[in-house]
């Protein structure tokens, strides 16, 4: 019997079969998938084959994982040599960010977009909590919108508190499997509650001391918006370490740098200190946003110092 993973709790998985029946399932024995070094062999969105337990008809044993079309992955916070799958087989990612309470760093945004670019997953950036914006924060939003939208990342301004912007976001969720990601406290669970009011998911709490969110969604879970649309809620990501993306291909995942491939003096240019670098010329001419280049250099330096 075939099914799709709707929730992963570590050792048990909630699987929806093709006939709409849900099963609590386990993975048979030790399982390696495509030699991918991950802490979680199965992820929400995975298509699987399973056998129903004849003694317990509500349970099943997973014996095969279908090939994945794509996935979003981050470096494991506990085992840095391993990755941790966030979601698989998705059509688009919705990144919720906030400029206040808590503030999402530009570096985090860029790292997430790199993870999406690695598998050509379209990304939408949702700037939430606009009801907290003053004039300076609105200017910051407009600047970031001017940076990201020309690169192909749609930007939407929302306030879950005031229900502003949902009319622009909701149509984008139709006929797709969408994964919602971001820091704790940015409003992911609140968004899911707006989309699925019958769920009444516990919402994020902001610590007065740290101004950072506390985890409320413990495990990723997928919900049916309708017969052709699904939304995946994910736990808050504190830090997003890139996994299996080497320095020599990092620029490929920056659209503004990818368009300049082959134009540098040296074919193996890292776009940092080399002479005749076309990318640096564009940065100096403000044709590439300085914040994007800073993110690129930060990742390059981080990887070089941890070799």
UniProtKB/Swiss-Prot annotation:
GO terms for molecular function: GTP binding; GTPase activity; metal ion binding; rRNA binding. Coiled coil: none annotated. Residues 78-240 form the CP-type G domain. One of its GO terms (cellular component) is cytoplasm. The keyword Magnesium does not apply. GO terms for biological process: ribosomal small subunit biogenesis. It is found in: Cytoplasm. It comes from the Bacteria. Its EC number is 3.6.1.-. InterPro entries: G_CP_dom, NA-bd_OB-fold, P-loop_NTPase, Ribosome_biogen_GTPase_RsgA, RsgA_GTPase_dom, RsgA_N. It is an enzyme of class 3 (hydrolase). Keywords: Cytoplasm, GTP-binding, Hydrolase, Metal-binding, Nucleotide-binding, Ribosome biogenesis, RNA-binding, rRNA-binding, Zinc. Its cofactor is Zn(2+). Zn(2+) binds at residues 264, 269, 271, 277. GTP binds at residues 128-131, 182-190. Transmembrane segments: none annotated. Binds 1 zinc ion per subunit. CDD domains: S1_YloQ_GTPase (cd04466), YjeQ_EngC (cd01854). PANTHER family: SMALL RIBOSOMAL SUBUNIT BIOGENESIS GTPASE RSGA, SMALL RIBOSOMAL SUBUNIT BIOGENESIS GTPASE RSGA 1, MITOCHONDRIAL-RELATED. NCBIfam families: ribosome small subunit-dependent GTPase A. HAMAP family: GTPase_RsgA. Belongs to the TRAFAC class YlqF/YawG GTPase family. RsgA subfamily. One of several proteins that assist in the late maturation steps of the functional core of the 30S ribosomal subunit. Helps release RbfA from mature subunits. May play a role in the assembly of ribosomal proteins into the subunit. Circularly permuted GTPase that catalyzes slow GTP hydrolysis, GTPase activity is stimulated by the 30S ribosomal subunit. Monomer. Associates with 30S ribosomal subunit, binds 16S rRNA. This is Small ribosomal subunit biogenesis GTPase RsgA. It comes from Cytophaga hutchinsonii (strain ATCC 33406 / DSM 1761 / CIP 103989 / NBRC 15051 / NCIMB 9469 / D465).
């Amino acid at each position: 019997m075939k099914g799709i993973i709707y929730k992963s709790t570590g050792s048990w998985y909630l699987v929806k079969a093709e006939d709409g029946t849900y099963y609590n399932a386990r993975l048979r024995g030790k399982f390696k998938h495509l030699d991918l070094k991950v802490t979680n062999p199965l992820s929400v969105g995975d298509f699987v084959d399973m056998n129903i337990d004849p003694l317990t008809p509500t349970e099943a044993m997973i014996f095969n994982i279908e090939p994945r079309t794509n996935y979003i992955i981050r470096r494991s916070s506990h085992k840095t040599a391993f990755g941790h799958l966030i979601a698989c087989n998705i059509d688009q990612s919705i990144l919720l960010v906030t400029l206040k309470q808590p503030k999402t760093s530009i570096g985090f945004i860029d790292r997430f977009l790199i993870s999406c670019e690695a598998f050509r997953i379209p990304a939408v950036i949702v700037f939430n909590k606009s009801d907290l914006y003053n004039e300076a924060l609105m200017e910051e939003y407009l600047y970031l919108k001017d940076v990201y939208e020309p690169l192909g990342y749609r930007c939407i301004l929302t306030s879950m508190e005031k229900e502003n912007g949902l009319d622009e976001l909701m149509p984008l969720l139709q006929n797709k499997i969408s994964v919602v990601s971001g820091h704790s406290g940015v409003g992911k669970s609140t968004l899911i509650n707006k989309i699925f009011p019958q769920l009444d998911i516990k919402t994020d709490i902001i610590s007065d001391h740290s101004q950072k969110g506390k985890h409320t969604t413990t495990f990723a879970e997928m919900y049916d918006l309708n017969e052709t649309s699904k939304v995946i809620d994910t736990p808050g990501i504190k830090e997003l370490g890139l996994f299996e993306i080497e320095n020599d291909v990092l620029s490929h995942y920056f659209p503004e740098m990818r368009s300049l491939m082959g134009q540098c003096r040296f074919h193996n240019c890292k776009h940092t200190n080399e002479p005749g670098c076309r990318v640096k010329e564009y940065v100096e001419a403000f044709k590439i946003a300085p914040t994007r280049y800073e993110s690129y250099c930060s990742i390059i330096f981080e990887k070089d110092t941890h070799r």
